[in-house]
Amino acid sequence: DLVDLSCYPLLGVWLLDKDRTLLYDLARNGKTIWEQRIGIVSTMTFVRAGQLDDTFAIAELFLNENEHLHDLLEKAVGWLLREAGKRDSERLANWLYPRASSMPRTMLRYSIEKFPEIERQHYLKLGK
């Protein structure tokens, strides 16, 4: 998809050393799912640079402000959480633990995809 292939190499790289408020605004107030998706997928650049804070913070926005997320947004958030977990699995586990029960199932499944089977089952039992 063009959004996924272009937003983090372009927008993410451009924002690497700048204020990232734009991504939060897109995630929270994007008029289309594609604008909202850009808000989270652009954080891939930061994840690859070891900067995970924005990914977790924007993921939190989707949990708090979007009661019925489109499945493409659930998948994107789960994907970026999984990528963040590849850099810091303990941080992802700690982030997920209090949220798994309120996360959309698709988002949770994507985020724990690389966990060992026993851990995956644990989080799935916490989930909806």
List the model feature ranges, each with a label.
Residues 1-128:
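Alpha-helical scaffold domains
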